[in-house]
């Protein structure tokens, strides 16, 4: 498969010119190592299942429940789905969604290290591709999607309005945007949340990461047609045409 303006590097489609993201990638991998969130190929292949002794076992149980809810929702749709995951990391969720019958999945991120791991681990999934994308106004091939998913990733985008407005033209007529596993705040909560984030990264010795983390509030979605599907304090959001749904 050849895409104009993209080169395939270790299984990942990479634009011929990269305009942003490399410093974030370096800082992000550094903090992931300190958090014990860099997984071996063997571990990634099994996610969201993970050893009960792993320090993040309970977190992965929550992610597994969230995934099952999303998978059931999508499996009930009476059509083949073309899916884009934004912020796919090591690709476990993109690969899991690629198990939907007749689906096609594109996983994207600006973390080339994790993308290459994803391409390596899931190389035998024929309906799955991975892209390094730093500008979602420049999706390769003018492709359109039935679903765009942000799973624990929208907090790394500074503007909800900007990223969602960039994504809307990428949807098919009845397409949906989903946002999951991200906490959305009331305005009165933001100051304290920012301090907690700074304190957390300060303990890890990675205060630069606090500058990449954005504490979005519910009112940022006011210009969109949004529906909350599930909200135990976090969210999944589904955007259909101009509508959005949240599911934690």
Question: For each predicted feature, which ranges?
Answer:
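A short, conserved alpha-helix within the catalytic core of class I
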Residues: 157-167
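Conserved beta-strand signature within the Rossmann-like core of class I S-adenosyl-L-methionine
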Residues: 174-183
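A conserved beta-strand element that flanks and buttresses the S-adenosyl-L-methionine
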Residues: 149
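Class I SAM-dependent methyltransferase SAM/SAH-binding core
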Residues: 92-137
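Conserved Class I S-adenosyl-L-methionine
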Residues: 191-213
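N-terminal auxiliary segments of SAM/dcSAM-dependent transferases
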Residues: 1-38
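Conserved alpha-helix/loop element of class I SAM-dependent methyltransferases that forms part
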Residues: 59-79
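Short alpha-helix
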Residues: 209-229
């Amino acid at each position: 498969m050849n895409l104009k303006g993209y080169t395939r590097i270790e299984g990942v489609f990479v634009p011929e010119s990269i305009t942003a993201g490399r410093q974030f990638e370096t800082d992000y991998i550094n903090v992931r190592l300190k958090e014990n969130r860099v997984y071996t190929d063997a571990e990634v292949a099994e996610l969201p299942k993970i050893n009960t002794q792993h320090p993040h076992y309970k977190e992965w149980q929550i992610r597994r429940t969230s995934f099952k809810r999303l998978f059931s929702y999508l499996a009930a749709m009476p059509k083949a789905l073309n899916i884009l995951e934004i912020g796919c990391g090591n690709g476990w969720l993109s690969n899991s969604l690629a198990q939907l019958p007749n689906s096609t999945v594109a996983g994207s991120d600006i973390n080339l290290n994790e993308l290459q791991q994803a391409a390596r681990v899931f190389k035998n999934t024929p309906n799955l591709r991975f892209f390094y994308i730093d500008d979602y106004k420049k999706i390769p091939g003018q492709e359109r999607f039935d679903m765009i998913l942000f799973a624990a990733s929208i907090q790394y985008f500074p503007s909800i309005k900007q990223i969602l407005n960039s994504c809307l033209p990428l949807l098919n007529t009845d397409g949906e945007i989903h946002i999951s596993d991200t906490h959305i705040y009331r305005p009165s909560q933001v100051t304290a949340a920012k301090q907690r984030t700074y304190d957390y990264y300060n303990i890890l010795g990675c205060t630069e990461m606090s500058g990449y983390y954005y504490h979005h509030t519910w009112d940022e979605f006011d210009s969109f047609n949004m529906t909350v599907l599930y909200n135990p304090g976090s969210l999944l959001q589904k955007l259909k045409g101009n509508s959005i749904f949240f599911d934690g």
